[in-house]
A protein has these predicted regions:
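Short beta-strand scaffold segments in enzyme catalytic cores
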Residues: 28-42
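Zn2+-dependent cytidine deaminase-like catalytic core
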Residues: 3-6, 41-92
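Generic detector of bulky aromatic hydrophobic side chains
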Residues: 11, 24-29, 60-68
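Short, basic/aromatic recognition patches
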Residues: 2-27
Length: 92
């Protein structure tokens, strides 16, 4: 059966959907952290927790946005899950 996605293709599709959750108006980025072909965390770029979802762009960069990778790593830390040795799949 040749139509089955390999693991990299599979995670690439999932991280693309994750990026669609981004609240950033300039760029939507998603990140998956994967260990042993299992997703241990995911994140997307967006506004700082507790801040108004208002886009403030200076020098072509959003001013109050947390990176997708930061969100995925922080999620692991909050749940006490080690991300050491994980593979990051990032859309951008």
């Amino acid at each position: 059966m040749t139509d089955r996605l390999n693991w990299d293709e599979y995670f690439a599709k999932i991280v693309s959907v994750t990026a669609e959750r981004s609240s950033c108006h300039r760029l939507h980025v998603g990140c998956l952290l994967v260990k042993n072909n299992r997703i241990i965390s995911q994140g997307y770029n967006g506004h700082l927790p507790g801040c108004k979802h208002e886009s403030i762009i200076r020098n072509n960069h959003e001013q109050a946005t947390v990176h997708a990778e930061q969100n995925a790593i922080c999620d692991c830390a909050k749940r006490g899950v080690s991300c050491e040795g994980a593979t990051a799949y990032v859309t951008h």
